[in-house]
């Protein structure tokens, strides 16, 4: 797997899913995010076995030099992306010995990976979503009627509203 992507694009997608990744993990792979690439898009998945977040971004023509999938440490990847200059172009490559090499300018980082096949997925590929249409006024009214029940401080971030 190999792709070239702007720092801001990768950071934007990564920041959407890193919240679901466990800091203290029971399984090593749960501290990773799953990265999938093809000619059209980059998809990143993060999970803690209760919540799964998936975010995608379109890739420009020629950005994906080799399609593939792997998992990399989420927080380390996030910190590396944050430390790079704003207009940086990141060359992300998975080697044959399953190492993730990130290059940008004079910087070079090597991260360990785990097989993408071992990553736990909560959704199924053929699941069909349900769509509901609600007016803005009705949705606001529903939020106002239930807001009092939201937890203010809870380790399970999805319960805090």
Put a short name on every predicted segment.
Residues 1-161:
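Structural preference for solvent-exposed beta-strand-turn elements
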């Amino acid at each position: 797997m190999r792709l070239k992507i702007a720092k801001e694009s990768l950071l934007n997608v990564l920041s959407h899913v890193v919240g679901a990744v466990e800091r203290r993990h029971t399984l090593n792979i749960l501290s990773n995010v799953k990265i999938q690439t093809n000619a059209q898009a980059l998809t990143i998945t993060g999970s803690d076995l209760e919540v799964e977040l998936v975010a995608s971004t379109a890739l420009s023509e020629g950005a994906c030099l080799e399609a593939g999938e792997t998992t990399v440490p989420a927080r380390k990847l996030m910190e590396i992306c944050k430390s790079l200059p704003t207009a940086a172009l990141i060359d992300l490559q998975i080697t044959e010995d399953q190492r993730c090499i990130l290059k940008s300018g004079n910087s070079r980082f090597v991260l360990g990976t785990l097989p993408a096949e071992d990553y736990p997925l909560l959704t199924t590929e053929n699941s069909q979503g349900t769509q509901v249409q609600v007016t803005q006024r009705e949705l606001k009214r529903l939020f106002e009627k239930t807001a009092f029940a939201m937890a203010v401080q809870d380790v399970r971030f999805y319960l805090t509203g």
